[in-house]
Amino acid sequence: MHNVSCDNMNNSPQGRLFVVATPIGNLGDLSRRAIETLTTVDLIACEDTRHTKNLCRHLNITTPLISYFREKEQEKAEQLLHLLQAGKQIALVSDAGTPAVSDPGAVLVTKAREAGIEIVAVAGPSAITAALSIAGLTQTNFFFGGFLPANKT
């Protein structure tokens, strides 16, 4: 069984990795638990520090930020893994939605899991479930194949 939990209690000398979902359009969608997590961790690893800085400023969160973007994901994952092993509590966020779901994060989550680091899911807004909820469909099964490619014209 993997070290994955849903609470903010820590009984381990190692750090924990919090995978925190962020708003997909309305800052009011961020949960109290996500705000508490972002406020109390030692470091926030984010896809784009400029974007996350705006979110933190809006919520008066002063936790230090470190960039964690796709082009440097392997290198940054190693750096963050060392911090986790040293006992740091780290939140991982993407610009909008859930890290590792069509956004950076899977490499760090995998490395943390392999190293025995506890991983805590802090659920939040989801574009796909929001779209399904208002589509009027009665489907119980669906497939998410990722985002459409960016229009380059």
Feature map (PLM): residue ranges:
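Short, glycine/charged-enriched secondary-structure capping and boundary segments
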Residues: R33-E36, H58-I61, L80-H82, P104-V109, ...
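Short, structured surface patches at the beginning of a domain
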Residues: R57, F69-H82
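Class I SAM-dependent methyltransferase SAM-binding "motif I" and its flanking Rossmann-like core
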Residues: V107-T153
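Glycine/small-residue-rich loop that forms an oxyanion/phosphate-binding "nest" at active or ligand-binding sites
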Residues: A77-S126
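Generic beta-sheet signal
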Residues: R16-V20, G87-S94, F142
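Phosphate- and divalent-cation-binding pockets in alpha/beta enzyme and binding domains
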Residues: N54-L55, A100, T129-A131
